[in-house]
Amino acid sequence: MTLQDQIIKELGVKPVINPSQEIRRSVEFLKDYLLKHSFLKTYVLGISGGQDSTLAGRLAQLAVEELRADTGENYQFIAIRLPYGIQADEEDAQKALDFIKPDIALTINIKEAVDGQVRALNAAGVEITDFNKGNIKARQRMISQYAVAGQYAGAVIGTDHAAENITGFFTKFGDGGADLLPLFRLNKSQGKQLLAELGADKALYEKIPTADLEENKPGIADEIALGVTYQEIDAYLEGKVVSDKSRGIIENWWYKGQHKRHLPITIFDDFWK
């Protein structure tokens, strides 16, 4: 078995999907989790205005609406805007919320918390790079989401999918630190298919993907940061042949991000050796 085959198997990616079936699969997954954990009544998710949070948010809203209808209990979905100061693409985030139609929409500006943390570190003699500050932003967003979830008997939804997972393109214990991943198994183009099936405006899934964490590189496209396109990543995940250069980049990211795919390492773990 090649490394490509191993990765595809581990991430559960199918070369071809039925969008309506995958929507139902994710919704049922989200419903089952709440039903299994009777102390939970809420899903929480940060909404950026990008493809992934838009899709996960709509799936979460559908799940709680069906649960309310099925059980008569007050399940809910809380969508949270988490800008750092003023977000350049705030209009996109609002369009995403209009599409998702969450039960509750909150806005928590993380700028004061992030800047305070950076000042405290600087005062201790630790100079924080712009890249590192970007990771602080991602982790602060998750701190806020878990704070809300803790107050409302909730679980936090993550947006990690196969194209993001294979490259490790997420912050460890930041956007990578969630309770459930309803998009896991889907690559980037398959996520677009689900949004199209759900009737989303094309603008919500055709915009250029960006983590937008670095102030020195505002809005830098994921594909530039990764050095490979999502089309090539998706092709790799679907078992297709990609160029040697792209294969090398993708597999290097896979190895580099292995530690992000595991809980804290114990003496019994050997994946890193």
Swiss-Prot record:
Pfam families given in the database record: NAD_synthase (PF02540)
Record's keyword terms, sorted: ATP-binding, Ligase, Magnesium, Metal-binding, NAD, Nucleotide-binding
Biological role stated in the UniProt entry: Catalyzes the ATP-dependent amidation of deamido-NAD to form NAD. Uses ammonia as a nitrogen source.
Any one GO biological process: NAD biosynthetic process
Binding residues for ATP: G46, I47, S48, G49, G50, Q51, D52, S53, T159, K188, T210
Catalytic activities: deamido-NAD(+) + NH4(+) + ATP = AMP + diphosphate + NAD(+) + H(+)
InterPro entries with a match to the protein in the record: NAD/GMP_synthase, NAD_synthase, NH(3)-dep_NAD(+)_synth, Rossmann-like_a/b/a_fold
UniProt: deamido-NAD(+) binding residues: R139, K172, D179, H259, K260
Name of this chain's protein: NH(3)-dependent NAD(+) synthetase
NCBIfam families listed in its UniProt record: nadE, PRK00768.1
Catalytic class of the enzyme: ligase
Family membership: Belongs to the NAD synthetase family.
